[in-house]
Regions:
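Acidic carboxylate diad motif detector
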Residues: 148-149
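N-terminal Rossmann-fold NAD(P) dinucleotide-binding loop
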Residues: 63-64
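C-terminal substrate-binding/catalytic core of Rossmann-like NAD(P)-dependent dehydrogenases/reductases
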Residues: 109-112, 116, 152-196
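Adenosine-nucleotide cofactor-binding segment
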Residues: 56-59, 71-134
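Short, glycine/polar-rich helix-capping loops at beta-to-alpha or helix-loop-helix junctions
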Residues: 6-8, 82-90, 154-160
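NAD(P)H dinucleotide-binding glycine-rich loop of Rossmann-like/cofactor-binding domains
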Residues: 1-57
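Short glycine-centered segments of the SAM/dcSAM-binding site in methyltransferase folds
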Residues: 53, 143-145, 169
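Helix-to-beta-strand junctions that scaffold the AdoMet/dcAdoMet cofactor pocket
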Residues: 139-141
Length: 196
C-alpha cells in the first residue's frame, strides 16, 4: 500500500468512493459502518437461513455486529461464544439468545457439552487460533463454517480430516466489497443499538 488507509487521520480518495451519511448519524455509529459492511457481505456469502441456529465465535466488533444484524433479521436462535463478560452481556442485549464465556466452558468436548448441540452454521469472527479450533469443533456434520476473523500471525491447528469426514462447508469472507450502501442503510436503522 502506498497511501494511508481509511483509518488514517487524513486520506485522499475520489468522490465516487464516498457514501453520504445522514446529518443525524452520530460519529461513533458512523465509525462502525466499515465492520458492519464486513458483516453484510459475510451474510450474503454464507446464504444464511433465519430458521437455522447460528453460533458466533468472537465478541469483538464484528461478532457483536453479526449478532445484532442476525437478531434484527429475525433469526430465531443466535448464540455467541466470547471471553469478555461485559461484551457477552452486550451480546445478549443485542439479541443473542445464549452466550458463553470460553474461559469457563473449556474446549472441544466440554464446549460441545456446554452448548448441548452442534450448530448448522458457525461464524468464526475471533481471528484467533483457539477461536478457529472452537468454531470447527462446534459445527454440525454437513454444516457451514463462515470464517470472517483475520488471523494475522495467529495459527489454527486446522483439522482437514474433520472437515472432510463431516462434510463441513468452509466459506471465507474478506472485506466489505459492494456492501456499503446496505451497511449505511442498516446503520441508520440500527443506530440506537450500535451506539451501545
Amino acid at each position: 500500500f502506498e497511501h494511508p488507509g481509511g483509518y488514517a487521520e487524513c486520506f485522499l480518495t475520489e468522490a465516487r468512493h464516498l457514501h453520504p451519511l445522514p446529518d443525524t448519524m452520530p460519529p461513533d455509529v458512523a465509525a462502525l459502518i466499515e465492520p458492519l459492511a464486513v458483516v453484510v457481505r459475510a451474510c450474503r456469502r454464507a446464504r444464511l437461513d433465519a430458521a437455522v441456529p447460528v453460533l458466533i465465535v468472537g465478541d469483538g466488533p464484528i461478532g457483536l455486529l453479526m449478532t445484532l444484524v442476525l437478531a434484527r433479521r429475525g433469526f430465531r436462535e443466535v448464540s455467541l461464544l466470547g471471553g469478555r463478560p461485559h461484551r457477552l452481556a452486550l451480546a445478549q442485549d443485542l439479541g443473542a439468545g445464549a452466550t458463553m464465556n470460553y474461559h469457563e466452558a473449556g474446549a472441544g468436548a466440554s464446549l460441545r457439552k456446554a452448548f448441548q448441540k452442534p450448530f448448522a452454521v458457525v461464524v468464526e469472527a475471533s481471528g484467533s487460533g483457539a477461536g478457529a479450533d472452537a468454531a470447527l469443533s462446534l459445527v454440525a456434520p454437513a454444516g457451514r463454517l463462515l470464517i470472517i476473523g483475520s488471523y494475522g500471525e495467529a495459527q489454527a491447528r486446522f483439522q482437514w480430516n474433520h472437515v472432510l469426514l463431516n462434510e463441513i462447508e468452509l466459506i471465507g469472507s474478506n472485506a466489505s466489497a459492494q456492501a456499503w450502501f446496505e451497511a449505511v442503510r442498516l446503520a441508520g436503522e440500527l443506530r440506537a443499538d450500535m451506539a451501545k
